[in-house]
Amino acid sequence: PLFAVNGTTTWETLFAHELSHHWWGDLVTCSTPQEMWLNEGWAVFSEHLFTELLYGAEAYQDAVRANNLDVLHYAAARDGNNYFAISNVPETFTYGATTYNKGASVVHTLRGYMGDELFFSCVTSFLNAHKFQPINAAMLRDYLSDCSGINLNDFFTDWVYQPGSLAFEIEDIGNTKGLTSSICIEQKK
């Protein structure tokens, strides 16, 4: 868009997003509109990846956290007060927050679940193996499972095919006597 060509870096992530469509949208593309997260969720993830490569891991984490908060607070409201799975989003909401933002959150989670080495290696291999073909979530799941040796069926069932988000509740952290408490939640394979 012309408004983004303004001589500053204000819109650099928009450019990263649009350039990523050379891979997620052109090299491979979703087989149906209901699988648009494969184009747009990966493009938003690519914005975050661009941020990491240019500004470092902390900037990446900040971008991911901001995106996750956006998903938790606003995605359902923007998508007609509906909680959708990222796969099989109704066509009316194809270009909604679930597709873009929740899709990116799931890709980030998949990266953490697989680990960087396997994730990037297998994703690159997937793109090469399926170039110029329509794809769907099951194809991605099966390919990444075979490539990595990690059974991703449960991951895709929980994160791709089910609506909503994980919810955590902390009931009691005890008396901290004025100290700050940190709670770390880690997802394991």
Report each predicted region and the residues it spans.
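Hydrophobic alpha-helical and helix-loop surface patches within well-folded domains
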Residues: P1-K188
